[in-house]
Amino acid sequence: MPDIALLPSLRHTCLQVTNQHAIDSPISVGLISLGCAKNLVDSEIMIGNLIKDGISITNTPEEADVVIVNTCSFIDSAQEESVDTILESAEMRKVRNLGQGLIVAGCLTQRYRKELPKLMPEVDVFMGIDQVEEVSQLVQVARKRRLQRPSEAESTSEEASPSEESPDSAPEAPVMEVTARPVYIPDVNTARFRLTPSHFAYLKIAEGCNHPCSFCIIPRMRGSHRSRQAEDILAEARALIAEGVKEINLISQDSTYYGLDLRENPHRGIASPEKFQEASASLPENASTLSSLLRDLNQLEGDFWIRVLYTHPAHWTDELIATIASCDKVAKYVDIPLQHIHPTMLERMRRETSRDYIEKLLERIRKGIPGIAIRTTFIVGFPGETEGCFRSLLDFIQDTRFERMGVFTYSHEEGTRAGGMANAIEDSEKAHRRDRAMAIQRDISRAWASEQVGKIFKVLIEAQADEKTLEDAKVRSWEHGHLRSDLEPQAPALSADEPWMVARGQADAPDIDGRIYVRGSLPTHTFQQVRITGHTDYDLLAEPA
């Protein structure tokens, strides 16, 4: 089970904590945050509200009066991790603190709000996305429910084992505070305690999704797309910059859809490139779009990067390409999940794009943004994916030569259109196809890394590398975070006998991309100029320029 509430110091938070009672509160909470960066922001909001209301946060499970598990339910493996974490928390409670309340939040509760109370009676409270700012009240509810179980309190006597929870003590059903279709979206005044290191942050510009992708359950869990007002986003960005944040990562379910719902008569369900271009062309000059937002962010004072994550290929415009190219503070980096390239697969996935459109879009992006690094992801083993469809994808990967790429095996998700499709692929074949695709990408990435040797990069210094970090770097793989134990070390020059710094360039998003290892000691959380001197399959080696 992940560690409970691995919190940074208070200097990392956007929230000004002045309530001394937060330290001496009789109620303490531990929080386990699972899933993506968007879910992490929800966890930050929950912790911010808890601290604001005088509830203390603990890193130690046995010290927590209430444990919150913020779950992910995007794919089967994430759902399994969420369920396992909930059940482990409930089981550990029997031996560490029978009076400990248990709250389950996030996407799992949104997806299975009707089923979970019967499936998990050991949970005290289920809360949804709309309730993240009500977390303090729900913590009180969970705590009260646990303290009202006298038979549990007595179970520590000689007649009862502390590891045995009396079924008579359980309430009839957990409290369920989950709305069917979330509408919540944070604003600049939302209490928030950042869980990222002090030098970078995630800034959520929108919530929800309007796309009809057949494999995805997100619209059902997160609701329809809803954008924040541009001035509200700018105000939050200013606050982050004032705190010393050097990299602002813009996140949402579809960042390229940003602003289209803010117009007077918003279009609903826009998906195809043609419909999107038509809607964009009719926007007034002062309308909020991702392009206008980036231009406004670029005008803010300070030395920082802006990185755009989670774009959709159907919603790119020539204006957006030109904006990224011209804004010096916007990282020359494109995160654009394509999922597949074969026409049959794109149609079955309901991606609303074609191979011809995708190829022309990538050509426009590379031509319009010199030095751009393109990250994409693909799904292999989707129902009906023949060997021919898959080979078409392999050829496309080989020809396009993405700087950054991830491959996921298709996850069967009930409640999705794809969940009822015939011609399912065996799990072993899915894994084999993923490995074949990543083998091609490994060679592409290594060739790209070799081309960077001798170049001067501006990098963000993150931390000093310890011995384990250096050892992992020698055999690190992007294949979903696994280490390549089958390979000989690729970077013998990475020695713990001398200092190395861990850094990232514009081509490296936090947690998902490569690293740059800089020889020597440099101040952390600063931008530095370095010269690339070597590489591994996925990482670069450098020295101060």
Model-predicted regions and their roles:
Residues 1-258, 289, 319, 334, ...:
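Proteins enriched for Cys/Gly/acidic motifs involved in redox and nucleic-acid/cofactor modification
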Residues 102-103, 111, 242-388, 398-399:
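Conserved SAM/AdoMet-binding glycine-rich loop
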Residues 149-166, 266-283, 468-497:
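Intrinsically disordered, low-complexity domain-flanking/linker segments in eukaryotic proteins
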Residues 252, 310-312, 338-340, 376-380, ...:
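Active-site proximal loops enriched in glycine and acidic residues that flank catalytic Cys/His/Asp
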Residues 196-199, 209-211, 330, 340, ...:
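Short flexible coil/turn linkers enriched for glycine and charged/polar residues
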